[in-house]
From Swiss-Prot:
<feature type="active site" description="Proton acceptor">
    <location>
        <position position="127"/>
    </location>
</feature>
<feature type="binding site">
    <location>
        <position position="76"/>
    </location>
    <ligand>
        <name>substrate</name>
    </ligand>
</feature>
<dbReference type="InterPro" id="IPR026590">
    <property type="entry name" value="Ssirtuin_cat_dom"/>
</dbReference>
<dbReference type="GO" id="GO:0036054">
    <property type="term" value="F:protein-malonyllysine demalonylase activity"/>
</dbReference>
<keyword id="KW-0479">Metal-binding</keyword>
<dbReference type="GO" id="GO:0036055">
    <property type="term" value="F:protein-succinyllysine desuccinylase activity"/>
</dbReference>
<feature type="binding site">
    <location>
        <position position="161"/>
    </location>
    <ligand>
        <name>Zn(2+)</name>
    </ligand>
</feature>
<dbReference type="GO" id="GO:0008270">
    <property type="term" value="F:zinc ion binding"/>
</dbReference>
<dbReference type="Pfam" id="PF02146">
    <property type="entry name" value="SIR2"/>
</dbReference>
<dbReference type="InterPro" id="IPR027546">
    <property type="entry name" value="Sirtuin_class_III"/>
</dbReference>
<dbReference type="InterPro" id="IPR029035">
    <property type="entry name" value="DHS-like_NAD/FAD-binding_dom"/>
</dbReference>
<dbReference type="InterPro" id="IPR050134">
    <property type="entry name" value="NAD-dep_sirtuin_deacylases"/>
</dbReference>
<comment type="function">
    <text>NAD-dependent lysine deacetylase and desuccinylase that specifically removes acetyl and succinyl groups on target proteins. Modulates the activities of several proteins which are inactive in their acylated form.</text>
</comment>
<dbReference type="GO" id="GO:0070403">
    <property type="term" value="F:NAD+ binding"/>
</dbReference>
<feature type="binding site">
    <location>
        <position position="73"/>
    </location>
    <ligand>
        <name>substrate</name>
    </ligand>
</feature>
<feature type="domain" description="Deacetylase sirtuin-type">
    <location>
        <begin position="3"/>
        <end position="258"/>
    </location>
</feature>
<feature type="binding site">
    <location>
        <position position="245"/>
    </location>
    <ligand>
        <name>NAD(+)</name>
    </ligand>
</feature>
Amino acid sequence: MSERQLEKSIEHAVELAREARNIEVFTGAGMSADSGLETYRDDKTGLWSNVDPQAMASIDAWRKDPEPMWAWYRWRAGVAARAEPNAGHQAISYWEGSDTVEHVHITTQNIDNLHERAGSSDVTHLHGSLFEYRCSDCATPWEDDKNYPQEPIARLAPPQCEKCGGLIRPGVVWFGENLPVEEWDIAEQRIAEADLMIIVGTSGIVHPAAALPQLAQQRGVPIVEISPTRTELSRIADFTWMSTAAQALPALMRGLSA
């Protein structure tokens, strides 16, 4: 993107943001890329590049052999816990606290909790969280002991539920599982109330989450996409700001403050 094109992108985004009072921010893995967390879809460095998703992210795989999955998710939780919110996360939190808007809501596909750690208070997790755990059988919550492996390990036995003896599992949504109904309903409601949607760092190919921006489009909500590359959602966006979250969102805040 040329310098002039970048200026135009900022001007357009700022113009839309100035007129909006209720903001819906829809984020994916690219949101956390500048925090050092690899995206799932990156062909060269993606977290899935050397791992079969069906082997580490399906309920069937968990039922067959939970130890490799427990080891992997505990390691991932440690990686996420050591990461820091980037400038993009901080910018959204700043926006929420500014007097230019009434409300900023985040619907995220991420499971790293970096939005909350940056200070955002209204975050809906479509795919759960690395830091929430429950019994596989009775759903009793398990308090995280934060004893995370420092390096990936092949196998680790999940702890057992004190109530029923079932295995403790990560509180994330796997292939073969439904998205949480309450979170989905909240996301739909916030989109219904929004007068601007910002899409950040998502490929738009993970369903049903990818259908949410289409709801905004159907309502006539202006959509700004922030992504280094064009995605499946670019066609429904009013325009795509070809940049990263850590670059574009602070630039947007500076534009609003000018």
